[in-house]
Amino acid sequence: MSSQNAKSIGGILETSTVPLVIQPQIVNDPAQNNITLPITLCAVCGDTSNGNHYGVPTCFGCSGFFRRTVRNKLVHGCWNGDGNCVIDKANRNRCKSCRIKKCFKKGMNKNAVQPERTSHSYTVEYVELPSFREYSKGLLPTHSDRLRFQHEHAQHEIDTSSVLVHLKNALQWVQQFSLFAVLSDVEKSQIILTQWPHLLCLALFENSEKIFIDEKFAQLAEKFKSLELSAQDYFLLKGIIIFTETKDGTDLKFDRQLDICIGLLNQLHLESSKSKSGRLLFLLGELKSYSTRQLESLLDLKACEIVISFL
């Protein structure tokens, strides 16, 4: 196939809203000769379609991704930060932001997604407090903990040493988190190695550390501060951060753990502010799209030593 033809086909896959049907296959069957079976491709990633889902022919992977995103009202940050990632069979798991954008572009209907069925008859209020206590037991900072830390650093200019203290505390928190503790050693190492920078950002925001990394970091810090988040909010946001899919293309996924954390966050604000959990998830997506290279460069080998000690 010429490069010009290949480019044309790539353009059709990216922009067309009409289901793409490739050349029919000829199946030689002893009972029936020359039966033609047209193969319809997924409108989102180009994989083989398994039928119409939410109004558009898609594969099971893209339809399931669309359903989870709509049900949980998830907001994702772009993997590259420009909103123009290629979504195909090989790269569909890399950028959730561009993938859901393409789902909508191809005409998938969010109103066709049914609410998740449940056989439980108890109310959300009944589940909320016991569930949160179960996962957060012993991990929420007390008022005295915060005062002690503030006192220890009150007389000193904020420098990398205080940031490293927060990093160590954040990783200790992760190791004691019940949803993390049950994972395999490989899964634990993967999370610590890939998620520590953004986890550290949340720890710095939570403790209102006045440290300037770059302009974007300062903007994010101000946004988190303006929401006046509780310790419970930060607890669940840290849980969501560590279980969110990473940029490195790893096959490790933590959908169950992620769903639990998001569900608890939604329950936390069910009565007080139904829109707050949505704003928090949107802001968390913005944090995930933030490049932490400057922060990592600032901490250099000292951070590496701390991270490695937790593997």
UniProtKB/Swiss-Prot annotation:
Main subcellular location of this protein, as a coarse class: nucleus
Q: Which Pfam families match?
A: zf-C4 (PF00105)
- State the InterPro entries in the record: NHR-like_dom_sf, Nucl_hrmn_rcpt_lig-bd, Nuclear_hormone_rcpt_NR2, Nuclear_hrmn_rcpt, Znf_hrmn_rcpt, Znf_NHR/GATA
Q: Which Gene3D superfamilies match?
A: Erythroid Transcription Factor GATA-1, subunit A (3.30.50.10), Retinoid X Receptor (1.10.565.10)
Tell me which UniProt keywords the record has, alphabetically.
DNA-binding, Metal-binding, Nucleus, Receptor, Transcription, Transcription regulation, Zinc, Zinc-finger
Q: Which residues bind DNA?
A: 39-115
Q: Which residues form the NR LBD domain?
A: 116-311
Organism's domain of life? Answer: Eukaryota
Zn finger intervals (NR C4-type) = 42-62, 78-98
Which Gene Ontology biological process is one annotated for this entry?
positive regulation of transcription by RNA polymerase II
For whether the record's keyword set contains Zinc-finger, the answer is: yes
SUPFAM superfamilies tied to this protein: Glucocorticoid receptor-like (DNA-binding domain), Nuclear receptor ligand-binding domain
Q: What pairs make up the disulfide bonds?
A: none
A single GO cellular-component term on record: nucleus
Q: Where in the cell is it found?
A: Nucleus
Recorded family membership: Belongs to the nuclear hormone receptor family.
Q: What does this protein do?
A: Orphan nuclear receptor.
Can you say what this protein is called? Nuclear hormone receptor family member nhr-111
Per the UniProt entry, what species is this protein from, by scientific name?
A: Caenorhabditis elegans
What gene is this protein a product of? Answer: nhr-111
